[in-house]
Amino acid sequence: MPLWVFFVLLTLTSGSHCSLPPSPPFRVRRHADAIFTSSYRRILGQLYARKLLHEIMNRQQGERNQEQRSRFNRHLDRVWAEDKQMALESILQGFPRMKLSAEA
């Protein structure tokens, strides 16, 4: 058997080594799938980064708000204590008058 016939037979029988390239519609579909997948992953990455950024900003804003709330609450407590003290003093100042008016 001539050598070239042997190579032709070997080429035709071995489908894995010398397979034909995929048909164009299959390649186009694979290419479109790859474009979609890479774009989808990029968008998911951007959404994840945006979510992390919002969480960090909300955490910082929450700490600021908590600090402002505690300052505001301390101020309210101080004002309430002062009002309570003034009301108590005015009541106590009224007692001697009440005693004097009750005795008279």
Curated annotation (Swiss-Prot):
**Species annotation:** Rattus norvegicus
Q: Give a short account of what the protein does.
A: GRF is released by the hypothalamus and acts on the adenohypophyse to stimulate the secretion of growth hormone.
Keyword Hydrolase in record: no
Q: Which family does it belong to?
A: Belongs to the glucagon family.
**What is the protein named?**
Somatoliberin
| BP term (GO), one | positive regulation of DNA-templated transcription
Q: Taxonomic lineage per UniProt?
A: Eukaryota, Metazoa, Chordata, Craniata, Vertebrata
Q: Does the keyword Signal apply?
A: yes
Q: Which UniProt keywords apply?
A: Cleavage on pair of basic residues, Secreted, Signal
Molecular functions (GO terms): growth hormone-releasing hormone activity; growth hormone-releasing hormone receptor binding; neuropeptide hormone activity; peptide hormone receptor binding
Signal peptide coordinates: 1-19
